[in-house]
């Protein structure tokens, strides 16, 4: 079985370009017994099915990788926005994550 044929356990479309018919997905999948977290670009083929491209990143899904990714996103967002704005817009999400 090829990596691109592995069934997805979970995915969320985090960007969609309707004009180019391209999606960027955050994907959690399992390959050879290891869970992976991927950020990958998908395209719409001629049969109107979404297919993965080689463009993206893939890493083992473990607590440290997930924590570092979350911390990196918060840091990047905080450079553009104040802590107050982050808490106002993402406070409920952050609280739900730590229940």
PLM regions and their residue ranges:
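Mixed-charge, Lys/Arg-enriched low-complexity segments
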Residues: 53-99
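Negatively charged, low-complexity tracts enriched in Asp/Glu with abundant Ser/Thr
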Residues: 1-19
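A generic structural micro-environment signature
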Residues: 12, 20, 32-34, 65-67
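A short, structured beta-strand/loop element
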Residues: 23-57
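Intrinsically disordered, low-complexity segments enriched in small/polar residues
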Residues: 8-9, 14, 34, 40-41, ...
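N-terminal non-cleavable signal-anchor helices
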Residues: 7, 14-15, 28, 75-77
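Generic structural "secondary-structure junction" signal
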Residues: 16, 33, 59-61
